[in-house]
């Protein structure tokens, strides 16, 4: 796994605006995607993730014009997802300036597309997004966990967290690695928008089950939550939205805090680091 930990702001986009919700529901406006992307890039974000969160549910492609506008104002790696079902969708996203393509619903419905994307664009371009939620109806063949006296397993959800699949998240993570995914974007639906910390049980379980990089997502409300996920799991990157969108914390200040607490992060923007070489 990579030594330097990455901090990744996330732009969840609906109707051309950045939004944020709670458990994938109760969506509210959080700003302009182009302005926020530029701000995060300048503050030293390592990468940016842009997710068109209603594309799959609405059975349409990602808003390409907006992807192009965001790509023009940043100089950091850029992952885009939402509504990717066929290779042409991925090609269009990459041609608009994205460096990586994230696929979730499309991969569950047609797992072979992961291999096809890897063969066509390279493993480094393929990010499989896994949205997982606790299911307390335990059954044979699932990875069972216990917390607060209750047993559960992690179920994969699709269509923006609206539909359960019956897939065990840990087993699905192993499968997507086998099929050729270069990275996993792992989001806890239970923790999404709560601002009370990442799901350490889910994150550690998936990280320990695969060899490819994993990005932790869902629940970050303060810098200490990032510190916790880096100290208590071997996750490669921490993604956050709320703490950055509402200006309670800036990317550079969060990274300074992590550095002060012995987490190896890259300080300074990509542009400023390049200027020093």
Please report, for each region that a protein language model flagged, where it lies by residue.
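Charged helix-capping and loop-helix junction motifs
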Residues: 61-68, 111, 166-170, 196-204
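Glycine-rich, proline-tolerant flexible connector loops at the mouths of alpha/beta enzymes
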Residues: 47-66, 105, 185-196
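C-terminal helical cap(s) of enzyme catalytic domains, especially alpha/beta-barrels
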Residues: 113-120, 230-269
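Conserved, mostly hydrophobic/aromatic
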Residues: 12, 40, 48, 80, ...
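Catalytic cores of alpha/beta
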Residues: 74, 78-100, 201-238
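Structural preference for beta-strand elements that scaffold enzyme active sites
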Residues: 6-10, 47, 75-79, 100-102, ...
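Glycine/small-residue-rich loop that forms an oxyanion/phosphate-binding "nest" at active or ligand-binding sites
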Residues: 63-125
